[in-house]
Amino acid sequence: MKQGFDHRKYLTIQSEHIKKRIAQFGDKLYLEFGGKLFDDHHASRVLPGFQPDSKLQMLLQLRDEAEIIMVISAYDIEKNKIRGDLGITYDEDVLRLRGEFENIGLYVSGVVITHYNGQSSADAYRNRLERIGIKVYYHYTIDGYPHNVQLIDSDEGFGRNDYIQTTRPLVVVTAPGPGSGKMAVCLSQLYNEHKRGIKAGYAKFETFPVWNLPLKHPINVAYEAATADLNDVNMIDPLHLEAYGEVTVNYNRDIEIFPVLNAIFEGIYGENPYKSPTDMGVNMIGFCMSDEEVCSNAARDEIIRRHYDALNRYALGADNEHEVNKIALIMKQAKLTTDYRRTTVAARERKEQWDCPAAAIELEDGTIIKAGSSELLGPSAALILNATKHLAGIPHEVKLIPQSMIEPIQRTKVSFLHGRNPRLHTDEVLVALSLLSTTDENCRRALDQLPKFDGCQVHSTVMLSEVDRKIFKKLGIGLTCDPIKK
């Protein structure tokens, strides 16, 4: 995969910039960490070269100076809110993340339960955490938050919250998902630190939108497509423009909330150290692109991927018509159609030629490989075989898996497992190749090509099964599907 982002440069300049921000405030910096620390696949897709755990690796540069506070809303505990990408509840994800952080040497000092007003489910969760030695703090709901500044900046507002004991100069505040109350936790701590005579500051780490790229840069447009369900909108930061005469990009929620933050800061310190939402940020990603065109093309692919993802969920019954329409509008404004994705055009051509479900993959060198479904194989399984043969230099007419092996597998699927689709999926094809590779040199060579799929793009003219989707994801393949059920 062509690289467009300098990962090593990012680790260096991002950690150094955070150190400078800590020094700006004196004793302590509360850093609100938006987005995902682990598995940031959106960033890795639009910035080829950015690793899914790049932000985590960056924090490891600061491990001796940093501690982590996990935040979870009592509302999310009560309704068992699910993290969509992992399929686990937020309360379980807090424990998962804590374990992941500590396994790599990062210190987690506690968990804050926000929006607390006596929920029994929150009390039970607190007891569960305390039994395994985790410090837990309650932060209460505040009437009129965030606009009732007089109450917020008082002993009945932030002063009512549990004071979180911290010991290190950098306090990273993170959560399983949005709406958990990370910013309020940071501001509450500023209030309570100030009362104790401790100089503390606040900064915000948001990967997107990238503040020093143009508003309509494909990377920023891709972020808008990714958050279409939240109705986020990228905007020119008018406060930054007024203060410095410099055009920067932020998103609507931060711009809308800034006057309130300004009043809260003034209530705590007497003045606001920041003149704009952009000032609050510490993101240095925009300085680390090594090939902007590679990143721009990847971002365009991501916009189209989001378009198909929304259409697929809508076809499966999701109530997301607004999201579908918004992404369609984003594509129109970006003068982007699905034909930009070469695999889409190729897969549809094969479908028309053979009158069957089809799929196509674009390899790293730009080669397009196509496949259609047959009585033996689904389109994705056939595509894996065709692509590995091409990469291994095996003639197309060579059959890697003999029909005599496929047919017994089909019989088991239908006769004994009561399946309706006898065709082999990608996982079944890969298992068959693995078994044959011990005696068949072609199968061994074909399997050895699998790492070359990382970063490749695939389009299918039908929606694939969950099994096939997971295999493509594990191989690092970017998948899109027409919203048509098999």
Where are these regions (language model features)?
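Flexible phosphate-sensing "switch/lid" loops adjacent to ATP/NTP-binding sites
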Residues: 1-173, 189-348, 356, 363-365, ...
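Residue-level recognition of the N-termini of beta-strands and the immediately preceding loop/turn
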Residues: 108-109, 357-358, 398-402
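P-loop (Walker A) phosphate-binding loop of NTP-binding proteins
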Residues: 176-177
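Conserved glycine(s) of the Walker
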Residues: 180-181
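Hydrophobic positions on the alpha1 helix immediately C-terminal to the Walker A/P-loop
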Residues: 185
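Feature captures eukaryotic membrane-trafficking machinery centered on endolysosomal pathways
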Residues: 349-377
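A short, polar/charged loop-to-alpha-helix boundary motif
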Residues: 376-392
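Short HxH-centered metal-ligating active-site micro-motif
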Residues: 390-422
